[in-house]
């Protein structure tokens, strides 16, 4: 079944997929209705069940060969960017280059930052540095980093993402600082 939509528009669904069965059913429905993308959020500790976004989107990518998959948004400042860069590059491979990495600082639930041992007031600066670290790691070349929050010796992350330079990074947020960060560091 096809929904008659203006071909210049793209339609996606931001959803919470609490089970594997729901993920499959929603993915198949979006494919049938010719949606363009599916987006999931991220929280460490939340009031409702939220699965890990990388694992969910890998499942979506296995069920659909055409849907763009994206995070909206991944709370990157709560994590070290090196393993996250590997997860994102892997999802880019599993999706055939259909991954958009939406990131943001969150912060509405301070207990999440406390649970991760990350000072909430550092979240903006950590996000900015994390984006720089991931772009380096996605270059396909040996790189090192010596920054304010993260440092590591020369490493060569392989394989590089399917998308040259890595998945597109979109920054979400509501503050002036978030808008400036998006303009400086993001692809959207």
Predicted regions: what they are:
Residues 1-63, 68, 165-167:
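N-terminal beta1-alpha1-beta2 module of alpha/beta enzyme domains
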Residues 1-18, 77-144:
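Flexible, glycine-rich active-site loops centered on histidine and acidic residues
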Residues 58-61, 89, 132, 180:
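Active-site phosphate/pyrophosphate- and oxyanion-stabilizing loops and adjacent acidic/basic residues
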Residues 18-30, 83-87, 172-184:
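Short, acidic/polar
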Residues 5-11, 35-37, 64-69, 95-99, ...:
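Short, well-ordered coil/turn segments that N-cap beta-strands
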Residues 150-157, 173-177:
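Active-site glycine-rich loop that binds ribose-phosphate moieties when present
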Residues 47, 71-79:
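Active-site nucleophile and cofactor-binding loops and adjacent substrate-binding regions
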């Amino acid at each position: 079944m096809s929904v008659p939509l203006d071909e210049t528009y793209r339609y996606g669904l931001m959803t919470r997929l609490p089970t594997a069965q729901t993920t499959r059913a929603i993915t198949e429905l979006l494919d049938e209705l010719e949606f363009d993308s599916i987006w999931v959020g991220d929280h460490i500790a939340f009031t409702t069940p939220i699965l890990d976004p990388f694992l969910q989107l890998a499942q979506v990518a296995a069920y659909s060969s055409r849907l763009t998959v994206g995070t909206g948004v991944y709370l990157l400042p709560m994590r070290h960017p090196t393993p996250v860069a590997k997860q994102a590059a892997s999802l880019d491979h599993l999706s055939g280059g259909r991954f958009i990495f939406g990131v943001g600082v969150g912060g509405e639930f301070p207990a999440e930052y406390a649970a991760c041992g990350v000072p909430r007031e550092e979240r903006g600066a950590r996000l900015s540095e994390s984006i720089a670290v991931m772009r380096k790691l996605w270059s396909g070349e040996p790189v090192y980093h010596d920054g304010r929050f993260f440092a590591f010796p020369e490493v060569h992350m392989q394989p590089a993402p399917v998308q040259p330079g890595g998945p597109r990074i979109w920054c979400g947020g509501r503050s002036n600082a978030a808008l400036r960060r998006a303009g400086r560091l993001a692809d959207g």
